[in-house]
């Protein structure tokens, strides 16, 4: 429910929700859809990639809702986003040709291609092994360092040490809201992990 509200899929039943200075509660469904497509990037646990399309085509999708962006510009931005997440060599690969970590990188590229005000990540490392999870956390920390707002939902308490602010919910209520003054580096944690055997 919280992510549906934050993602402009639902409106709050009470109170106000402002996204990038705009009140969401009073908006029409179509206005929320436009806001969602231009201001919010989504990253899901199960990637939500279209199976028979290439990485570039998947990343282009959010830009298709903006008539001011030409197809050439769409492709250019999608390629840049994929290069930024380390997939410049997988542009034409389809989902069945990529690992879970690569698919999640495509999902992150798709989330940032619109330069959104906020990125919502729902259990974004939930389906990944430890090493790949930390590779994804490194990307999120880099995006945050660039000034992006990221709301990362997780049930894994070990991940809170890598974020700047932690809010714990129980039964829809905030039970803890704390600032992390000692944010751990996901890159350092990744570097300390044993290398996979096929890399040695």
Describe these PLM feature segments:
Residues 173-199:
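Conserved beta-strand-loop-alpha-helix hinge in the C-terminal portion
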């Amino acid at each position: 429910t919280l992510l549906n509200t934050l993602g402009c899929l639902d409106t709050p039943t009470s109170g106000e929700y402002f996204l990038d200075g705009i009140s969401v509660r009073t908006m029409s469904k179509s206005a929320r859809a436009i806001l969602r497509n231009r201001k919010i990037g989504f990253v899901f646990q199960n990637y939500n990639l279209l199976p028979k399309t290439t990485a570039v085509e998947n990343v282009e999708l959010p830009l298709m809702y903006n008539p001011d962006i030409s197809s050439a510009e769409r492709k250019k931005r999608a390629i840049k986003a994929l290069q930024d997440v380390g997939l410049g060599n997988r542009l034409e690969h389809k989902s069945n040709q990529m690992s879970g970590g690569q698919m999640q990188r495509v999902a992150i590229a798709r989330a940032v291609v619109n330069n959104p005000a906020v990125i919502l990540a729902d259990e974004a490392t939930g389906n990944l092994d430890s090493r790949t999870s930390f590779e994804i956390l490194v990307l999120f920390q880099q995006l945050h360092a660039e000034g992006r707002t990221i709301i990362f939902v997780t049930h894994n308490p070990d991940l809170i040490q890598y974020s700047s602010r932690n809010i714990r919910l129980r039964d829809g209520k905030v039970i803890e809201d704390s600032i992390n003054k000692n944010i751990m580096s996901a890159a350092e944690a990744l570097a300390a992990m044993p290398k996979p055997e096929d890399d040695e």
